[in-house]
Amino acid sequence: MEIIFYHPTFNAAWWVNALEKALPHARVREWKVGDNNPADYALVWQPPVEMLAGRRLKAVFALGAGVDAILSKLNAHPEMLDASIPLFRLEDTGMGLQMQEYAVSQVLHWFRRFDDYQALKNQALWKPLPEYTREEFSVGIMGAGVLGAKVAESLQAWGFPLRCWSRSRKSWPGVESYVGREELHAFLNQTRVLINLLPNTAQTVGIINSELLDQLPDGAYVLNLARGVHVQEADLLAALDSGKLKGAMLDVFSQEPLPQESPLWRHPRVAMTPHIAAVTRPAEAIDYISRTITQLEKGEPVTGQVDRARGY
């Protein structure tokens, strides 16, 4: 079994060694320009077109949970990968736990009003504030995939009212499920904290705009953990300035790194991190990939395959 590996920043030698330990019958090599030798599987992130074009692969693994970048390249270069070759994404590989940590810590930060107390501290003001109640702090999750399910599960322990919005109905214990555009308003109008975990598709680009934000309760919060292109940043800033939104926590942006001139840097009610909410953890990723390749070789059912038409 031949496996080729390409990632512009990962330590290729470490990955090659670890993969060969996990798959003793495989030969793994780092792909380099000019390598046209046969391969059965490809592990990639931002691959050049020529790496995959014309290859008779059994499967391709994207080294991340998001596959919008590779799908965009496939749409621009259909010759890059035959439609019959399955594409897999990393289903969890430790990302679920990271998303849980991030989401829970931020919801609690807002619930306990730590943002307000930091503002008071900056003014040297000693002023206890009224507490929020859990009943008035409903959390709504847009996107009910693997990571959305993990975040909902972690928030249940804290007693917040929970709801999710997705393409298909979910039956998660203790979570109200809303489906499609026709139920979006009902989902939004009782959501105090909006967590975005949507996939990046043509239907979701720019979805967090003034029309959507106006449907949230006054004083709501937005936590974006998905993709920067989901948010119309000017609309978000306008909602913060008007008081419609009380705060926003952003891990992703329409342009990364975020330009120095962006007003998001200086807005007092915007907090941010540099796209680190959930990163690929090599050991967990290799465990998933090696297990899935073994199942594919045996003809067993697998999970994590990307639906190219849907975009995730």
UniProtKB/Swiss-Prot annotation:
GO terms for molecular function: glyoxylate reductase (NADPH) activity; hydroxypyruvate reductase (NADH) activity; hydroxypyruvate reductase (NADPH) activity; NAD binding. Pfam families: 2-Hacid_dh_C. The active site is at R227, H275. Its EC number is 1.1.1.79, 1.1.1.81. Keywords: Cytoplasm, NAD, NADP, Oxidoreductase. It catalyses: glycolate + NADP(+) = glyoxylate + NADPH + H(+); (R)-glycerate + NAD(+) = 3-hydroxypyruvate + NADH + H(+); (R)-glycerate + NADP(+) = 3-hydroxypyruvate + NADPH + H(+). InterPro entries: D-isomer_DH_NAD-bd, GhrA_Enterobacterales, NAD(P)-bd_dom_sf. It is found in: Cytoplasm. It comes from the Bacteria. One of its GO terms (cellular component) is cytoplasm. It is an enzyme of class 1 (oxidoreductase). Its main location: cytoplasm. CDD domains: GDH_like_2. Belongs to the D-isomer specific 2-hydroxyacid dehydrogenase family. GhrA subfamily. NCBIfam families: PRK15469.1. Catalyzes the NADPH-dependent reduction of glyoxylate and hydroxypyruvate into glycolate and glycerate, respectively. This is Glyoxylate/hydroxypyruvate reductase A.
